[in-house]
Amino acid sequence: MKTKPSIGLMVVMLMFPQIVETIYSPALGDIAQSFSVTYTQAAQTLSIYFTAFAIGVVVWGLLADKWGRRPTMLVGLLVYGLSALVAMQTDRFDVVMLARALSAFGIAVGSVVTQTMLRDSFSGEELGKVFGVMGIGISVSPVIGMLLGGQLTALGGYQTVFFTLFVMALGLFVYNVFKLPETQIQKQPLNMGSLLGRMLRDAQIWQSTLLVALYNIALFSYYQLGAFTFEALGFSSSEFGYSGVVLGLGTFVGSLLNKFLLGKGRTQTSLLWIASILLLAGGFGVFWAQTSIWFLVPMLLVVMAFGIAIPNVLSAALVDYKQQAGSAGAVFGLMYYLLIGAGLGLAGIIQNLGVVQISCAVTVSLVTMSRMKK
């Protein structure tokens, strides 16, 4: 008999990686000033974060199949908490970068193991609906992160942010010790070479990988570049934090719209097409309006597109790999997080939010059209 985890706990664990990333974004300006580095160097910590996150997804995904879901989750949370503690105490920028990489490696467990546990416990239409609920949770996580990050940065700078992250990780670790069940029924023999070859030859996997990566780059490039855009427009880090409320509302509306349309029987293909159109409109709007605070209005369309697209892509991506859910999730996660890291690295160099948004939107449209031709 399957032991199903609490949906509430799963929502929190899937939200946590996004919360801890966006809570850090308002502190980028403070980090640049405190360590006397450029904004471009400070922004690159986000690219490093996602690259290390990709490695973590692979390691924790493989360990989830080998050790089990529960112990893997606990070890990952422990690694994250200790890394946040190191980042809080150092006075060297290179150590901050290393601690950020290790923290990303650790918290990747919240993404890959949570998704694996959901795929263990649910299937078919039920799994799609559960991921819809997850999407609603994910939609509010940037709001929480940005608001907390803005206030904490104003209160005590980046060190207060990292201390808060440590406390949050410790609290989740203790809660999971008592409440997280094991969902793996039996361990499956793993032929990693065979699995990797199969996935790399699967066009559906590549399409899903590109869509997840591009929608995330569109979203997180705002958290990467937005703090500097706000400063250039004369706004503070706390005011940048408040902007997360606006964008979180957009993602929340997108997630609710996704849930409503799924309930009305709309197909995944039609929902992805709607998301693609919203992203195109939002991307061009951001490009045209980015010299004023009104660029937040088209950014709403971008985050709405994210809220619609991501639950649909994630729920369907690994339907043919259920017997090796952890390892397949690890490979899938590695693929899209490496692309996210590379994309945000380019975004940090370009330092133009509008150009990044248009590039993501056009590419998403092409991938969506190729997916519809199947």
Show the residue positions of the predicted features.
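Paired small-residue
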Residues: V79, S83-V86, D94-L102, I293-L301
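C-terminal transmembrane helical hairpin of 12-TM major facilitator-type secondary transporters
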Residues: T269-V313
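Conserved MFS/SLC helix-loop-helix module at the cytosolic interface between two early adjacent transmembrane helices
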Residues: I55-F93
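A late C-terminal transmembrane helix in Major Facilitator Superfamily
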Residues: L314, L318-N352, Q357-C360
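Juxtamembrane intracellular "pre-TM" segments in multi-pass secondary transporters
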Residues: P181-S208
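C-terminal membrane-cytosol helix-exit motif in multi-pass small-molecule transporters
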Residues: F166-I185
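Helix-breaking motifs and short loop linkers at transmembrane-helix boundaries and internal kinks
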Residues: S36, G68, Q89-V95, G106, ...
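Cytoplasmic helix-loop-helix junction between adjacent transmembrane helices
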Residues: F93, A99-V140
